[in-house]
């Protein structure tokens, strides 16, 4: 399963910003084989979740130093709560699991109870509460045996909350600042921010899991779609560096190029983005020779970057000319003619150099005449 991104070139335009992405809908941006469908996935048996690692004998042995707790009674209460869960009385089961999590603190019962409480909230489509409960469990029980399931749930929640961005032809990077008092499947405020928090949680708590790179890719693409290109560049770069074997590598390279281009602010500002873009384009062409349909776009963008680097030298030379430092201007003119001799900026620089040569005798005469 791969994410498909089509990059097209705007006909007749060779500027740095001409190559724009035509991104797919949210359905194509999801590893669907790992994610339960929303809004109402089938409930997963609590017994199945527990059977992977639960042993009553080991359970009691681990916590026999807590004489104040009747762990056997806790286990029996948990099984009763599971029975209610299987009967799909999720609200009643949620209350039971909540009570167990408060009574059996710092025991495996607490871990399982918090997880099952979150499952009840998820299956009743109260996703903000479910997110909070999943996060509580992950914070306290790092490396939980429920981690894989929790990651899939968190990803599903994020995908649901961000679907308006990924399906829109003109996505907005914000939700209306109106509190949500009626839809319990969405948070009170900051819908997109909560979705990004869930994606971040996946990467922090399960960095080597099957959804870590998917979460990072969705985060990067979200920022790209809402035109926050510096943030998008940061996340695409993180994906390229942290997940070299990810199926999203080629797309992260292509959209990384676009993010860097859009982040460039012009010759008056730092030109580091141009250098990084040039390196990334070369890396993309070298690592992904099969991207033949994008090669022409990459080559044209590379040429545009080269022209912009030449323009930066020309603008710098002009700055020194205007500020009364002709010798410094000449240094940049010479550098421009040597590095980019086939550009119009080099031709302009050469004209300036020729003019400066004509002025040398005049300047010398003025110098000696000052002593007469």
Ranges and model annotations:
Residues 1-12:
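Bacterial N-terminal signal peptides
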Residues 13-372:
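Acidic, polar-rich low-complexity tracts and alpha-helical solenoid repeat scaffolds
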């Amino acid at each position: 399963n791969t994410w498909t991104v089509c990059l097209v070139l705007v006909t007749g335009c060779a500027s740095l910003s001409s190559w724009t992405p035509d991104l797919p809908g949210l359905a194509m941006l999801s590893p669907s084989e790992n994610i339960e469908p929303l809004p109402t996935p089938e409930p997963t048996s609590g017994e199945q979740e527990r059977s992977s690692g639960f042993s009553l004998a080991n359970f009691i042995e681990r916590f026999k130093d807590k004489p104040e707790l009747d762990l056997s009674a806790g286990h029996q209460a948990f099984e009763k709560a599971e029975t209610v869960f299987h009967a799909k009385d999720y609200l009643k089961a949620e209350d039971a699991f909540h009570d167990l999590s408060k009574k059996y603190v710092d025991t495996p019962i607490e871990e399982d109870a918090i997880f099952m409480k979150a499952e009840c909230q998820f299956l009743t489509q109260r996703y903000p509460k479910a997110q909070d409960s999943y996060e509580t469990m992950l914070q306290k029980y790092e490396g939980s045996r429920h981690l894989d399931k929790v990651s899939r749930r968190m990803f599903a929640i994020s995908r649901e909350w961000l679907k308006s961005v990924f399906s829109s032809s003109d996505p907005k990077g914000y939700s209306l600042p109106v509190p949500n008092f009626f839809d319990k499947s969405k948070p009170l405020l900051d819908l997109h921010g909560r979705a990004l928090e869930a994606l971040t949680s996946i990467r922090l708590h399960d960095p080597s899991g099957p959804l870590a790179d998917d979460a990072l890719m969705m985060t990067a693409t979200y920022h790209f779609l809402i035109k926050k290109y510096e943030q998008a560049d940061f996340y695409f770069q993180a994906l390229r560096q942290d997940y070299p074997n990810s199926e999203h590598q080629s797309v992260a390279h292509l959209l990384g190029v676009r993010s860097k281009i859009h982040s460039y602010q012009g010759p008056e500002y730092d030109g580091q983005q141009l250098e990084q873009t040039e390196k990334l384009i070369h890396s993309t062409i070298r690592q992904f020779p099969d991207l033949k349909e994008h090669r022409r776009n990459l080559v044209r963008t590379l040429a545009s970057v080269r022209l912009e680097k030449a323009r930066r030298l020309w603008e710098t030379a002009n700055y020194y000319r205007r500020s009364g430092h002709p010798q410094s201007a000449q240094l940049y003119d010479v550098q421009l003619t040597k590095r980019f001799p086939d550009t119009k900026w080099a031709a302009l620089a050469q004209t300036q150099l020729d003019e400066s040569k004509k002025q040398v005798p005049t300047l010398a005469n003025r110098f000696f005449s000052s002593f007469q």
